[in-house]
């Protein structure tokens, strides 16, 4: 079995039910496409768009809805450069003092937006992502939870065939550069500009790591919540590459959970790219150590199936890459602080 077909087989075990098998079959077809001359490696070029700052111009899809309105207000209060939003049929109106457009394409042309955040109900969220991809928005952050998995397989297939748009999520808290730009639902006040890059599959555990690194005085350089769904647009490796190449990021916290093999892949990446005297300290926590096989634990992707995806295997893989694994989420801040102390980086 080729590596690509093996990846599709892993997904079949990760997603339960007939919809999961159908999704895996569909994704396996997309994996086979490179044999027909279609390039998929180009999507990695969009990693650069993960870095947001005070100059990032954002639109909101689902702008006038309840969630879109609330979180757009929060973003504006934080100082994020929100320039407008879309709600089909409400183009030409204003909302929160900003213009409303019918389409993402129109919004991008009129505002020069470089990012979009999506607060659209699950049945329509995949179409919203596709619209942003077609408009070539550089960064798309989809907060929505509960998008049908087959919808996301089709979105991922579309993503992998282009290089202009980078997707974070779905089912994620978003991305934040403290003090500069907040795209998503994270509480802004717990963040502090600093030295730690945080990437996580869990939203609430992200906030825990943020609060602790703020408390120990290290702060955060960039925080990315990649989401807990099995078919997402950004994984650990995408974020790790940004962190390793970012001079402002001096240490990394990686928060994983049971299900899939993203943590094992991240460990392999760190072995290859973060070793030697100039390596950056990496601390991790893996949620679900006591989870029983076959039972989904919260997130759609958090399930041990087919003998794969267990916490112990993930912890071993990360430790073999030189990562310090904390056994408690309450100790992430003190653990990374001790690593800085040990390396005389304080």
Swiss-Prot record:
One GO CC term on file: succinate-CoA ligase complex (ADP-forming)
Keyword Repressor in annotation: no
Pathway listed: Carbohydrate metabolism; tricarboxylic acid cycle; succinate from succinyl-CoA (ligase route): step 1/1
Localization: Mitochondrion
Catalytic activity: succinate + ATP + CoA = succinyl-CoA + ADP + phosphate; GTP + succinate + CoA = succinyl-CoA + GDP + phosphate
Keyword field contains NAD: no
Record InterPro entries: Cit_synth/succinyl-CoA_lig_AS, Citrt_syn/SCS-alpha_CS, CoA-bd, CoA_lig_alpha, NAD(P)-bd_dom_sf, SUCC_ACL_C, Succinyl-CoA_synth-like
Modification N6-acetyllysine, positions: 54, 57, 66, 81, 105
Coiled coil: none
GO molecular function terms attached to this record: nucleotide binding; RNA binding; succinate-CoA ligase (ADP-forming) activity; succinate-CoA ligase (GDP-forming) activity
Highest taxon, organism lineage: Eukaryota
GO biological process entries: succinyl-CoA catabolic process; tricarboxylic acid cycle
Activity regulation information from UniProt: Inhibited by itaconate.
Catalytic residue list: 299 (tele-phosphohistidine intermediate)
Protein keywords: Acetylation, Disease variant, Ligase, Mitochondrion, Nucleotide-binding, Primary mitochondrial disease, Transit peptide, Tricarboxylic acid cycle
Post-translational modification N6-succinyllysine, affected residues: 57, 66, 338
SMART domains hit by this protein: CoA_binding
Pfam families hit by this protein: CoA_binding (PF02629), Ligase_CoA (PF00549)
The EC number(s) this enzyme carries: 6.2.1.4, 6.2.1.5
Binding site for substrate: 207
Quaternary structure and partners: Heterodimer of an alpha and a beta subunit. Different beta subunits determine nucleotide specificity. Together with the ATP-specific beta subunit SUCLA2, forms an ADP-forming succinyl-CoA synthetase (A-SCS). Together with the GTP-specific beta subunit SUCLG2 forms a GDP-forming succinyl-CoA synthetase (G-SCS).
Recorded family membership: Belongs to the succinate/malate CoA ligase alpha subunit family.
Medical condition linked: Mitochondrial DNA depletion syndrome 9: A severe disorder due to mitochondrial dysfunction. It is characterized by infantile onset of hypotonia, lactic acidosis, severe psychomotor retardation, progressive neurologic deterioration, and excretion of methylmalonic acid.
Protein name in UniProt: Succinate--CoA ligase [ADP/GDP-forming] subunit alpha, mitochondrial
Gene source species: Homo sapiens (Human)
